[in-house]
Structures are given as structure tokens and as C-alpha cells.
Swiss-Prot record:
Residues 45-55 have a biased composition (Low complexity). PROSITE patterns: ZINC_FINGER_C2H2_1, ZINC_FINGER_C2H2_2. Gene3D superfamilies: Classic Zinc Finger. A zinc finger (C2H2-type) spans 218-240, 288-311, 318-340, 347-365, 379-401, 412-434, 440-462, 468-490, 496-518, 522-544, 552-576, 594-617. Residues 67-83, 102-111 have a biased composition (Polar residues). Pfam families: zf-C2H2 (PF00096). The keyword Ribonucleoprotein does not apply. One of its GO terms (molecular function) is euchromatin binding. This is Protein suppressor of hairy wing.
Amino acid sequence: MSAQEDALPATPPASSSIKISDGDKPKEKRTGTRMKLLNDVAAKAAVASKGASVSPRLKPEKRTSIKILNNNNNDEAQTSTKGGDSVPRPKPPAPASRYRTRSSAPASSAVETAKIKTSPSKKKKMDHYVLQAIKSENNKAENTTSVVVVEDEDTIDFILADDEVELGAGAKENGEEFVVSGVDEDDDDDDDDEDEGVVEGGAKRRSGNNELKEMVEHVCGKCYKTFRRVKSLKKHLEFCRYDSGYHLRKADMLKNLEKIEKDAVVMEKKDISFCCSESYDTFHLGHINCPDCPKSFKTQTSYERHIFITHSWSCNDYPCSICNAKLRSGALLKLHEQQHQLRGKPFACKICGKDFMCSYHLKCHQKYSSCSANENDTMSCKVCDRVFYRLDNLCAHLKQHLGTQVVKKPEYMCHVCKNCFYSLSTLNIHIRTHTGEKPFDCDLCDKKFSALVALKKHRRYHTGEKPYTCTVCSQSFAVKEVLNRHMKRHTGERPHKCNECGKSFIQATQLRTHSKTHLRPYACSLCIQKFKTEKQLERHVKDHTRQKRASFACTECTRSFRTSALLKEHLDAGDHSPVKSTRAKRSAKMIERTDCAICDKNFDTTETLRNHIRSVHECDPDDIFGTEPPAKRKAKKTVVAAVAEEQKEQEDDVPARNTSAGSLISSKTDGNGVVVREFLVDEGDGNAQTIDLRKRGLHHLPLEGDKATESTAETDIKAESSKEKPSVSPVVKKEQRKSLAASLAAAIADNLEEPSSDDEFSGEVLTEEDLKLKENIAKLIDMLVDPQTLKKYGWPNSSEESVLCKVIENCGHDLAKGSEAYAELDYGSRMPILQLLFTVVIHNDSIKALLNNFPIDDVIEYVLGDEDQDQDQETDKGKDREADNTDTDTREDAVESEA
């Protein structure tokens, strides 16, 4: 080495990240050789940048060329020296840094270099893109050293290839080829890269061979991050999930949720996010807005990455011809358009960026979505004045006023639970609940879901998005269903009502939880009754024990015994006195008679009976029983039976008794007889025989035979003498009559059908045209309005005109013209009203055109004619199929007969 070379600086240029692969030498012996080679390379680069010539004592017989690609020093000349003058001493640069320092916005020189040296190669089954391929200009020169410098603000990448240049003793002896470049971002692979025989990006180390290989940078097709090794790229692809113009580093993916970067598009409701193709429901809120596009970002890092990828060049130079994307280079634009083609969706919306498979779907999207609507293009509902930006949403809203519901189709039936669904997609989602399949997993936690909609809702809890806000209290929610449930608190709506107690709830889950309280899980082992709580069951079992003891009760006192032996032992004792015996008998009779005289309901005690009479029948128990105790008071009951006329003549005459309006307790057919129960109010004494039914009070008259025979269960027929009874006040009698009359009316009303109330058009005289129009209206109503709504308006018992007016008025149209009703209008005045039926039910441009050009009669016949024609065609097809089947059977029979 010459003195001039010895005087060169001993450190490489500033902000350089250099990595040397020098064969299979041990690492502890490479340090001196590596530093000396770095010093020589840095010296050559500094000499070339100053335009000075290299000393001839560096082996003057060989030609050394250095090429510098640096936009900051474009005026510097490329030098080629063979010897000569001394080299001035440059300023000593800063020591090399092991780690690369990433700038906020790379300089344009890197892009220029990539454009100059772009010759993609090595495309053998590569699943990524090759953006840079730096190759020596003179591959055939045996004694050529090429140095390519790609410089930005913080990094200088060197590629040096010459195994004959005398740069150091170790290098000359081993004849190694060195690649000096920026360190890969994957620091974990540094040691492996030094030991492997393949240089970064595919450049092989060749000892004693002057042929130079190319260096290739591998780029991720989703986030455009570059790698020099395929292994590093494949490892990156396991974590890179986004293709919207930015990427998430591996370290960021594994950190907590606050540091995960997500792009967002701030758009109107119902728009589609450009960055992730999600709807407005899942768009990511951000606070850092891009001044050149409608995107916003959560972190400064994601914003700077977006600026570098999208807006580092003039966005207007490379706009996408399919969507509204604008890219920074022609290469990225080409890759972006290829993604449209690979996805099979070459048609995209220019406003929201959503792409479609065919142009028809794009036109429908532009017609019915808010991408083509503005504040002036609004449609309001005539019923509730609600405003809509899309026609399909308005049509769906009007169906709610009409009562139209989506019909579940039997062809979409689950083979497991036999439930029907609206479409095949909903059926497939439902089947996953039986199979347990959950193909949609969250990338932020371990949860999995059976539907994509459920996954989108779940992601909002990670991102903290709450796009649904209450207009009353400004509280925000992540899911729309939760907002709807919250709004019912403000409106007081409780649609879920309990059938047992009548209590209402907002949610169906609340009703299901409440319904469990009405379940009776505690069943009695002695009878069929069930109870809600265990205490109620214990109380009921005590009643069974009390009744069992009452079967062995003493007739002289109130004591009861479990067995007959104990009762006999008690009676043999002889401890009862006559006074005690009388009181005991009276108490026993009172206990025996504790059933209600009005509804025949039994009770355990007289106190519960009195409470029942006060609460249920709203009467005073003393007025019902008088001055006598309940055991002494006998309810005057009689039974009547409806029998045949020939049986009535044969019945024994029973003296009539003065009674008032009664209550029909029950009337039913039992076997071959009719049993009727009736409660009659006794208004006075009479010389008649009464039927006292203590327990059941059933009077059964068989209908077969010539004479009706009477058989009464537990009935005592006594001749009751006339005697004074306690008087009842007129007020009490009036209340009794009112209560019993109401009970009788309610019982009769249950067996009557509700009369038709739509008789307003019954007296109208119809002409032949009106009759034809009336028939067509009936067919039209059946075809256009769903059966539930028709049944609500009294169809088919009500007239066609009445149902037609109710349907139209329910949609917000006032049909009354002064005091005139529809039936009072003439034939010509009815036409506009009939035309309204099409307006509120059918949203079809062709039908509207027919209404504007033809009479309403012709339009109705046209619509009905199509339906009849379709039915005729189906009938003809069915007949043809039957004829074909008949011919086939005939041919088969002929073949069988021949055989």
C-alpha cells in the first residue's frame, strides 16, 4: 500500500450501515480485516466523490472504476484513473452505525436510483414483487471493481465486487468477494446471514471468479416493505394482513392494542372505507387527518408511512383508472390495478372505492347508495315524515307501515331443527350453530365466530369504536341493536309481555329470565300440583297431612288422628262433655263448608273464603252469609238441562221459585247428556222443592230413551218449609244482580262470534262496471297486500272498498273529501284513489308509466292478466308433464308386454 493510501481516514462515511460477508473465517479473526477493508472502501468512495484520481501505486496495471449514483452530487464527475497525482486528505467521517436510522420521509434520490436500476429478474415462481435489481454494467470485465452507492439522508448502501483489488492483506490472500450494504431490519438474522454462503438478496460468493451476480430486493405485495432475503419476506407475510397501502410491523402486531396502527376513512354513513373495504359500521376513528385525501390516522407513524407511499410524488400523476386511489409511481399503479384484476372485481366506485364484479352491480350501487346522493336528493315518508337518502331504504320502511313481513321459504329449511329461513346465506350461517364451525377468528384475541357480521361487531370492542349515538342522551354504543334497546328506555316501549302475570320487558332475554319464576319445579308426590318454591311445597304437604288426619277426626272435639286405632283409643277414653261435643260438631261443620257460593271454589279456612269474596267478587261476606256462619248458610243452587222436546213433556213438574237473573256457570255435553250449571239468586220464600248441591251441584239428564232420568251426584232433595229468612238490603241485592249479570254476559259473549262491522257499503247499487272493478280490486288486494294486514282490516268479510281505503289511509293518504266517503263517489272519482294503491304498494317504473298513459281499468286487467297467464302457463306445463309421464308409462308397458 502507498503512503497516500495509508493517509486515508480510518473510519467509514457518516450514517452508513455496512455489513460484510467474508467467507468461512472464524468471527474472532475477522475484525481486523473487516475494519481495514471498510477503511479502504470508504477512502475510495471519498476520493471518487471529490473527483480526484487514484494513486498509480494501487496496482496500476489494473483498471479500477467507481460509479456513484447520488442525486445530491450529480454535478460530481465519475472518475477513472490509471495513476498519477496525489490525493488530498478529506475530512474524517463519523464512524459507521450498526443500525439503520429510518427517516420520516426518504429523499427522492432513492426512488430515482430504483427507477434507473430496475430490471426485475429471478421471477421463478416468486409470490412477491421485485422492484430493484442492481447489476454490474460490465459483468465480463475480469479486473473491474464496481461500487454502486444508493444514498438518502441517513443511509448509504455499497455493493463492492472485485476479488483482485488490493484492499488489504486478508482480502488479497483469500480472494473474497464483499457485499457492503445497509443492515437488514430483521436484526435476528444477522448472524445467520454472515455464516451462510449466500449473500443478501441472492448474490453468491464466488472465490476466484470475476463474474458478478445481481442483487435483488424482495418486496411485500401488501405493504411494500423491502427485504433482501426470501426467508425474511416469508416470515413477514405471516404477520402482514393488510393490503390498503400500509403495513404493520411484527413488533407492533404483538404489542398492546393501544399501539396497533389502523387507517381510517372519515365518510358519511353507509359509505365504504377505502382502506379496509369495510362499511361505515366498522370504520376506524382517527385524529390525524391527511390534507391530500380523506383519510385519518391514529398515530403519527402510520400517517408518515401513508405520506411516503401515497403522496411522496404528485398524486395527480398516477391515478387509478378503476377506483379513486392515487399512487406515487407507475410501478405501484400497475401493481394496484393488477390487484383489481386478480380479485375479479374490475369495476369500482369513484367515491367510496368499493369494487364490483360487473358494471350492473356498480350502477345499482351508485343508484341506491349515498355515493350518488346529496343533501337535496332526499325522500321522506308520508306517514311519519322520516327522511331517507336511498330509495330501497324508503321502500323497506313503507313495508313496516303496511305490515308486510319477509316470508320464510320452506326450501331454506334446516334439516336438523326444521326451521325455515329467508335465504340460503342465513341458512348456512344457522347450520354452523349445529356443526360448531366458527371460521371467522379475531386477529386481536382468541375468540372465533360463525358469521362475519358477528366478527365485525366484536372488533369494535377492541378499537373502542361507538358509531351509534343516542339522540336523546348522547350516549354512544358499538352495536346498533344495543342502541335500539336503549331507545326503548326513553320511549317506554316494552314489547315483551309475560303471559302469566302480564309484566312487560324491553328485551326478550329479560322475559325468558322472568318466565323461569313462573315455572313450578317443585312437584307434590301425592298429587299433580307443582309449586314455585320449596316453602310452598312444604305448606301444601301439610295440607295433605291435615286432610289425612281429618279422615280420622273425632266427632266430639277438634282433634284428628293419623290412624283409626288412635281415634278409637281416643273415643274409648270418654273425656268429652256435652257442651264440648256441641261446639266440636259446629266447628266440624264450619270446616266442612268453606266453599264459595258464587264460584264454587274451595278454601281451607273461613278467613280465606271471606278474603276471596271481598277481592274477587267485591262483596261483603256478611251480606252473602247473613247472620249465620258459613257452615249454616246453604247456597241455593239449581240445575237446568236442555233436552229434546219429547223429553220435556215427560219431565216431572217442579214448583217454581222466585228467582232473579242468574249466572251461567257451565254448560257442556257429557256422554249422551247435557249438563248445565246455573246460580240463581233467591229473592223470597216459596213452597217449592229446592235442590241443594253441597259439593258439585251437577244435574245430568241422559238424552237417549223415551224418558229422561235424573241422577244427581251428592244431591239431597228436601222439602223446604216456608220460614222467615234474614232480610237483605236493596243495595246489596242491586250489587249482586249487577255482578251476576256481568258474569252471565261474559259467559254468553264467549260463545258468540263477533259480527262484521263493515256494512257501510252493503246498500250500494252497483253497475256492471262497478261489479267488474270490485272483482278486480279483490284480486288485486289479495295479490299486493299480505294476508296478515288483510285479516287485520276484516278481510274477506269486509268489502273490497273498505279494505282498500284502510290500506291507503294507513300509508298516510287522506281519502275523505269533505263528508263524502269512498262508496259515495262516482265511478270516475274512484280512479285516482285506486291509482294510489299502486303508488303506496308497487315501486315499479313500468307500472307508473302504464298508469300515466292508460286507464286504471286496463292497468288492473294487465297486472291481473299477467298473473292469470302465468298460472295458465304453469297449468299447461303441468299437463304437459303429465302427458309425458303417461307416454313414458305406455312405452314401458309395451316393452314389458313384448318381453
